Amino acid sequence: IDVIVIDHHDYDEFPDACAIIHTKMSPDYPFKEICGGILAYKLASSLLGKHDKYLFSLAAITTISDMMPLVDENKSLVSRGLQFMNEEKYLQLELLIGENQKYNTTTLGFNIAPKINSFGRLPELVNPNHLVHYFLKDVDQKFAIQISQYAKKINSKRQSLTNEQYKNILENSQKDEFLYSYDQEVHEGI
């Protein structure tokens, strides 16, 4: 199987792949701080031969969830993606954002992204293929509702585990201004 790697993270050594799409590897690409989601969008647009508002919206979400700087290309992409989200009302996003919410960088960063990212934070609780299926354009509504509810449940679990560990750290620490804690038993996703 030929593999194309699309990413924005720094590596000491890149994986063996048919192709690697990475802005930081290109001396000619003018803006290096775009995320893998934008790169994936650009590849998809090229393969489709057109721009797609839904995929554009997903690229905007990945820009926020990856905490990329909102300058230059990122700023214009997120702004346009928010416009599309507010106009189009995509089912998958509506189910995650919460009732009576408008799309903005805050709702993307605090309502939508944590629910999506929870699948990666607690991978032993989920089948990641469900999230891929969830974001298909023609997803079944019943399936989308089920997965969005599960995403909310997993995110609540992640929040509870995080709060529990934070409380444990505070209880077991000295009252210093600087606090560092390491515990091999703490789940890596929190």
Residue ranges with predicted function:
Residues 1, 48-190:
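Hydrophobic helix-and-loop "lid/oligomerization" segment in the mid-to-C-terminal part
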Residues 2-6:
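Short hydrophobic alpha-helical runs that function as membrane-insertion/retention elements
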Residues 8-11, 23-26, 184-185:
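Short, ordered loop/turn segments at secondary-structure junctions
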Residues 14-65, 72-74:
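Short alpha-helices
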